[in-house]
């Protein structure tokens, strides 16, 4: 994420057309998916998601609350209900959706009043959600990936990921680049991962040059 940068550059309309809602994911086409599948040798999977719980680090004002509900709660009883003594466990969740491990939709960020494809906030925002660029428009993604490990740098406050950190990475159009920053080691330390102001709350921002690198 690039913060603390202003620009007067007009970035719309998108090269994919003024009505596009997929952004650079347009480059993940059938040929790119087949290229990615040909790279598979062992079939291993890696979970990139963190567990959601009430003490996860969040932006100020955001929250996650989960309440377990069982048949016993409903029936005020110790066992199940009916002739077959059936029981069940469900949960009630109240949360800000923009927390934990997630994928940002193109509607999430704007510079001033303009977001992707020049959409204004008033054009995007409806009373029950966004009118355009919502996460429901994001296509399924199967593509080639590059992992860049910058965790050994142990950055101080205000340090950013710069082009020089990218080393010999040479992605082609449609590839995904993932950064291992080491920040996950602080996941269970809300005092380190939550801040009262926007910029310090965003660990390891990238520089403007690395954001535009490809």
Residue ranges of predicted features:
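Active-/binding-site microenvironments in catalytic and ligand-binding cores
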Residues: 1-214
């Amino acid at each position: 994420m690039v913060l603390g940068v202003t620009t007067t550059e007009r970035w719309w309309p998108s090269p994919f057309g003024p009505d596009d809602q997929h952004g650079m994911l347009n480059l993940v086409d059938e040929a790119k998916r087949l290229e990615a599948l040909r790279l598979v040798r062992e079939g291993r999977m890696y979970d990139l998601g963190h567990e959601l719980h009430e003490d996860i680090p969040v932006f100020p004002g955001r929250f996650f609350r989960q309440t377990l509900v069982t048949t016993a709660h409903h029936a005020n009883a110790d066992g199940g209900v009916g002739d077959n003594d059936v029981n069940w466990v469900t949960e009630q969740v109240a949360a800000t959706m923009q927390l934990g491990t997630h994928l940002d939709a193109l509607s999430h960020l704007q510079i001033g009043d303009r977001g992707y494809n020049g959409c204004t906030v008033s054009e995007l925002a409806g009373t029950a959600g966004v009118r355009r660029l919502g996460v429901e428009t994001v296509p399924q993604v199967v593509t080639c990936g590059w992992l860049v490990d910058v965790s050994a740098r142990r950055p101080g406050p205000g340090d950013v990921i710069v082009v020089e950190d990218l080393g010999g990475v040479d992605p082609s159009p449609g590839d995904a680049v993932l950064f291992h920053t080491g920040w996950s080691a602080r996941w269970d330390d809300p005092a380190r991962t939550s801040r009262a102001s926007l910029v310090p709350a965003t660990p390891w921002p990238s520089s403007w040059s690395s954001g535009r690198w490809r």
